[in-house]
């Protein structure tokens, strides 16, 4: 009986150790996933910021282009009056 109890205890101990090892591995995996998530979040924020900057630059260039077109039209209008 004592021998059987010892064997059961050893099996239980092995199962507990396996569970502890599995939990440790899962915790490490969670940490890696958290780091990956933080990295991807930072990258997404940077891309969002870059997109906003590009949109602002695009708006400015379009406004500059319209202003130049207006100046050219004005100059052409003045030239028409001179002729």
From Swiss-Prot:
Taking the record's annotation, the residue ranges forming a coiled coil are: 7-80
User: What's one GO BP annotation on this UniProt entry?
Assistant: FtsZ-dependent cytokinesis
Keywords, sorted A to Z? Cell cycle, Cell division, Coiled coil, Cytoplasm, Septation
Pfam families in alphabetical order? ZapB
Can you name a GO cellular component term? cytoplasm
Q: Which domain of life is it from?
A: Bacteria
Query: Which coarse location class describes where this protein primarily resides?
Result: cytoplasm
Entries under Gene3D superfamilies matching the protein = 1.20.5.340
Query: Where does it reside?
Result: Cytoplasm
Its biological purpose is as follows: Non-essential, abundant cell division factor that is required for proper Z-ring formation. It is recruited early to the divisome by direct interaction with FtsZ, stimulating Z-ring assembly and thereby promoting cell division earlier in the cell cycle. Its recruitment to the Z-ring requires functional FtsA or ZipA.
Subunit structure of this chain's protein:
Homodimer. The ends of the coiled-coil dimer bind to each other, forming polymers. Interacts with FtsZ.
The family note in this entry says:
Belongs to the ZapB family.
Designated name of the protein:
Cell division protein ZapB
Source species:
Photobacterium profundum (strain SS9)
Q: What gene codes for this chain? A: zapB
């Amino acid at each position: 009986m004592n021998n059987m109890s010892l064997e059961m205890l050893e099996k239980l101990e092995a199962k507990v150790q396996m569970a502890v090892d599995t939990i440790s591995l899962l915790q490490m995996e969670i940490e890696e996933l958290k780091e990956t998530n933080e990295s991807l979040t930072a990258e997404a924020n940077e891309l969002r910021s870059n997109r906003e900057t590009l949109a602002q630059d695009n708006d400015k260039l379009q406004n500059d282009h319209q202003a130049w077109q207006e100046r050219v039209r004005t100059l052409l209008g003045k030239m028409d009056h001179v002729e």
